């Protein structure tokens, strides 16, 4: 039981550490001669995000390594009786990084940090929309309220329960974070919404 609590606490700590970042698509368009380079970097960040999203809970480190295209840097390792755990990090373009946590050789948690995505033109995340989101709603319900897809920033599979955290960002600041447990909203938070 102590081991289970320790594992749960460490995974909760990982989720709490998720940055305000979101999707891999960085919609900050450049001007003049810098635009092609910035677009290329945004495209690389989107590619990295797509790799992150395609990583499924329950796969092995070798499978994750194949998806990411390289070995990860080990950031944590422990062996406590019958529970072995290890965490790995991959650094991507423009400060983007992916962290994966394995228990007994199986992926249990993933997170991505360092990327941003803004609301599409004409869309905005508002306090009114935040207030419309209720516990128990599905992702599609939330997307319907907000008018666009959120960005998956973390996922944890623990004790037969799946927890996903998505972010929605405004172009001029402010964001909404929604946590889904087994496909239903279980918490939400916002910062600087009007």
What are these regions (language model features)?
Residues 2, 6, 11, 24-67:
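N-terminal, intrinsically disordered, polar/charged segments of Gram-positive cell-envelope systems
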Residues 2-3, 110, 188:
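A general lysine-centric signal
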Residues 11-17:
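Secretory targeting and sorting signals
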Residues 18-22:
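C-terminal motif of bacterial Sec signal peptides marking the signal peptidase cleavage site
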Residues 28-32, 36-47, 76-79, 108-129, ...:
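Intrinsically disordered, low-complexity Ser/Thr-rich linker and spacer segments
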Residues 48-55, 87, 124-133, 165-167:
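Second-shell loop/turn segments in exported
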Residues 57, 61-106, 114, 135-194:
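A cross-family detector of function-defining hotspots
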């Amino acid at each position: 039981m102590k081991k289970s609590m320790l594992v749960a606490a460490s995974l909760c700590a990982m989720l709490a550490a998720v940055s305000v970042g979101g999707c891999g698509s960085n919609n900050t368009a450049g001007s003049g001669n810098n635009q092609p380079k910035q677009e290329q970097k945004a495209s690389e960040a989107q590619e990295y995000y797509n790799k992150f999203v395609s990583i499924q809970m329950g796969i092995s480190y070798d499978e994750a390594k194949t998806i990411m295209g390289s070995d990860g840097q080990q950031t944590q390792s422990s062996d406590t009786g019958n529970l072995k755990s290890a965490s790995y990090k991959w650094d991507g373009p423009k400060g983007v990084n992916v962290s994966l946590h394995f228990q007994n050789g199986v992926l249990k948690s993933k997170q991505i940090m360092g990327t941003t995505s803004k609301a599409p033109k004409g869309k905005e995340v508002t306090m009114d929309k935040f207030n419309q989101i209720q516990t128990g709603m599905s992702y599609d319900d939330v997307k319907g309220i907000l008018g666009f897809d959120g960005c998956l920033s973390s996922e944890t599979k623990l004790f037969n329960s799946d927890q996903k955290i998505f972010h929605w960002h405004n172009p001029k600041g402010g964001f909404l974070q929604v946590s889904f447990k087994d496909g239903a909203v279980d918490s939400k938070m916002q910062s600087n919404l009007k």
